[in-house]
Amino acid sequence: MAAETAKHVRVSADIQMLGTELLLYESMNGFFPPTNQGLQALVTEPTVEPRPQRWYQLTKEVPKDPWGNDYVYRSPGLKNVNGYDLFSTGPDRQPDTADDIWANDR
């Protein structure tokens, strides 16, 4: 039980950090990275459209969730159509299921 709680705390911290970096990206460029660029746009400059006018590396690497999976990022989001969706698929490793972990709505 404590291990699962620790994993949930880590997911919340990771999503908060990534959320801050996404807001910086958006403030510099006027848009969040689209789904096809994903969170990798925070690490390496996108080479596909829409390309940011003012790109800076905002993180050295995108963390994996505590279960070893990539965080799910969608922009525009399905849940947050004016922003983005960012969540962990949780222990079942399947998106859009009951055990997904969302830290904040963006």
What is the predicted role of each segment?
Residues M1-A13:
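Amphipathic alpha-helical segments typified by the pilin-like N-terminal helix
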